[in-house]
Amino acid sequence: MKVAVAGDSAGEGLAKVLADHLKDRFEVSEISRTDAGADAFYANLSDRVASAVLDGTYDRAILVCGTGIGVCIAANKVPGIRAALTHDTYSAERAALSNNAQIITMGARVIGAEVAKTIADAFLAQTFDENGRSAGNVNAINEVDAKYNKF
């Protein structure tokens, strides 16, 4: 599985810890905030990573900022992306299993590195069942997305 890990100025330290933690099991790419350009605002970083997930460059991604909220909002602006703010393993699992989230976000000022590692592991261990009972909900999310994102 190809996984992108990125953090803004507040999240880059935790993003590095997560990337190092995952490298033995996944094909991990660390995206630095300076790679995103445009003064490295978290919105630009989120856009770059979410767009790369959408085009298939990465299968999943983890975005980190101070709270996880800003990168989550920004990633969800990319049509077709489902990003979820996760600060516990149950939410990370459900993000993948119930919502087919491609991206999780977290706050470096909210959780510590060891908890963040368990959250990343929980998210990446799950696979969405396209024929499962949550598929209808995800299809409905996609329909709402298409309704408002007519490009």
UniProtKB/Swiss-Prot annotation:
GO molecular-function terms, A-Z: intramolecular oxidoreductase activity, interconverting aldoses and ketoses
Enzyme Commission code(s) on record: 5.3.1.34
Enzyme class label: isomerase
Catalytic residues, chain numbering: C65
Disruption phenotype: Cells lacking this gene do not grow on erythritol as sole carbon source, in contrast to wild-type.
Catalyses which reaction(s): D-erythrulose 4-phosphate = D-erythrose 4-phosphate
Keywords: Carbohydrate metabolism, Isomerase
A GO biological process held by the record: carbohydrate metabolic process
Lineage top rank: taxon: Bacteria
Pfam families cross-referenced by the UniProt entry: LacAB_rpiB
Pathway entry: Carbohydrate metabolism; erythritol degradation
Sequence similarity: Belongs to the LacAB/RpiB family.
Function as written in the Swiss-Prot or TrEMBL entry: Catalyzes the isomerization of D-erythrulose-4P to D-erythrose-4P. Involved in the degradation pathway of erythritol, that allows B.abortus to grow on this compound as the sole carbon source.
NCBIfam families: PRK05571.1, rpiB_lacA_lacB
Protein name per the record: D-erythrulose-4-phosphate isomerase
Organism of provenance: Brucella abortus (strain 2308)
